[in-house]
From Swiss-Prot:
One of its GO terms (biological process) is positive regulation of cell population proliferation. Belongs to the SCF family. Coiled coil: none annotated. It comes from the Eukaryota. Disulfide bonds join C29-C114, C68-C164. Its main location: cytoplasm. Glycans are attached at N90, N97, N145, N196, N207. The keyword Cell division does not apply. This is Kit ligand. One of its GO terms (cellular component) is cytoskeleton. Residues 1-25 form the signal peptide. Residues 239-274 are cytoplasmic. It is a single-pass type I membrane protein. It comes from Equus caballus.
Length: 274
């Protein structure tokens, strides 16, 4: 019985080990994003609508995969948020804004550190010159939310050379996400702020279709092989134990027959004595 339990436990641990790729986190830096991003809504409401925030915008955010621009964009966001933080540091009535911005700076700095740890040398980038532009709070934090959303889906599986080239006809002014004039609506999760921009969402979905298919294939293959290996181990174990079980059953039957014969012989002797 103990050997049987040992084999069962071994098979369970083997299955868990082989299924490990399925339970890993999808975003490599997702754990760096805290619930403090929910305070962006409050911050945007507190800032004047005509207030301008300087930011170096990376062209191609809506036409290239996220791994092409996220590393550059998060560094520029860190610089802009740090500059914004300094402007509120000495204003007593702006302590609430200061606290929110300070938390956002820490999140972005953690993301910068995470990207440096997972940087890929195989990505060939060819960006146009990045010029500093002025954005309203609504526009700036829409870009911020887009970047945070990208981190939740980002997975560095760039094993082969990947070219990130922005078309020469694309300019920041033509980027619909920057120039959008729709009402600013931020839900508890920053990713939902992009739903009203249907054209950008469609482009994003088409860009990631190929990558998502590859990711599903990469997860499905280990799962399939783990099932095959698990069934193979189970079959081998059953085949190994089957002769022993057969012999055990035969021995039990023989013992029962011997006992019956013994009882009959004993009764026969008692009857003869009587």
């Amino acid at each position: 019985m103990k050997k049987t339990q040992t084999w069962i436990i071994t098979c369970i641990y083997l299955q868990l080990l082989l299924f490990n790729p399925l339970v890993k986190t999808k975003g490599i830096c997702e754990n760096r994003v805290t619930d403090d991003v929910k305070d962006v809504t409050k911050l945007v409401a507190n800032l004047p609508k005509d207030y301008k925030i300087t930011l170096k915008y990376v062209p191609g955010m809506d036409v290239l995969p996220s791994h092409c621009w996220i590393s550059e964009m998060v560094q520029h966001l860190s610089v802009s948020l740090t500059d914004l933080l300094e402007k509120f540091s000495n204003i007593s009535e702006g302590l609430s804004n200061y606290s929110i911005i300070d938390k956002l700076v820490k999140i972005v700095d953690d993301l910068v550190e995470c990207m440096e740890e997972h940087s890929s040398e195989n990505v060939k980038k060819s960006y146009k010159s990045q010029e500093s532009r002025l954005f309203t709070p609504e526009e700036f934090f829409r870009i911020f939310n887009r970047s945070i959303d990208a981190f939740k889906d980002l997975e560095m599986v760039v094993s082969k050379t990947s070219e990130c080239v922005v078309s020469s006809t694309l300019s920041p002014e033509k980027d619909s996400r920057v120039s959008v004039t729709k009402p600013f609506m931020l839900p508890p999760v920053a990713a939902s702020s992009l739903r009203n921009d249907s054209s950008s969402s469609n482009r994003k979905a088409s860009n990631f279709t190929g990558d998502s298919n590859l990711q599903w294939a990469a997860m499905a293959l280990p799962a399939f092989f783990s099932l095959v290996i698990g069934f193979a181990f189970g079959a081998l174990y059953w085949k190994k134990k089957q002769p022993n079980l057969t012999r055990a059953v035969e021995n039990i039957q023989i013992n029962e027959e011997d006992n019956e014969i013994s009882m009959l012989q004993e009764k026969e002797r008692e009857f003869q004595e009587v």
